[in-house]
Amino acid sequence: MWDDVKVIESSDANVRKYVFSKSNAVAEAVLYKYPTYDKRTVICCSTQSGCPVGCRFCGAGDNFVRSLRWDEIVSQPVRLLEDTGVDPANMERLQIMFMSMGEPLLNLKELIPALRELYARFPNAALLISTIGPQTDFGPVLSISKEIPTIGLQFSIHESTDERRDKLIPFIKKSSLKRISLLG
């Protein structure tokens, strides 16, 4: 799947960053333990290699390469969970979040089958989609959330007005705060 995986561990060993790479893509995922993996495990994984959104505060910036395939998305939490040494079924709290590199809702075609596969493998996991709220049809997200009861949608707002938000997130085709509040 991936040609190379680099792992960087924090000095206190509570956080591990993974960089997955191959000739035409890079993805990042992060593994957190609170305070142990069997108590609470949180994974943040990528849905795209780079990101087309261009948030001013994000390291992915405007360096968009491509959207990841569903199996490339799934392979990230699978690898991270293997590295915990704990059976995911025995974790008191497991969260898999789509919020590392890329805008998940700009890759719904691949995200939805990834969500189905992850739910089949880890039915106890909360599957959380973090989004800036691009102007898109939210129907597929609402539909899959009825099929998979552990899915959650969270909006990355970052600012309290559309004007200030536009400076921080220059992506033109994002939903207004009013639309997000109506979806929310």
Predicted regions and their residues:
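Flexible, acidic/Gly-rich N-terminal and inter-domain linker regions that tether
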Residues: 1-41
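Conserved AdoMet/S-adenosylmethionine-binding subsite of the radical SAM
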Residues: 81-184
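Short secondary-structure boundary segments
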Residues: 5-12, 17, 73, 95-104
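Basic side chains
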Residues: 17, 76, 164-165
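Non-catalytic surface loops within mature trypsin-like serine protease
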Residues: 22, 33, 49, 157-159
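Canonical Radical SAM [4Fe-4S] cluster-binding loop centered on the CxxxCxxC motif
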Residues: 33-79
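Residues in well-ordered beta-strands of folded domains
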Residues: 19, 30, 46, 97-99, ...
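Short linear Ser/Thr-Pro motifs
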Residues: 8-11, 46-47, 130-131, 156
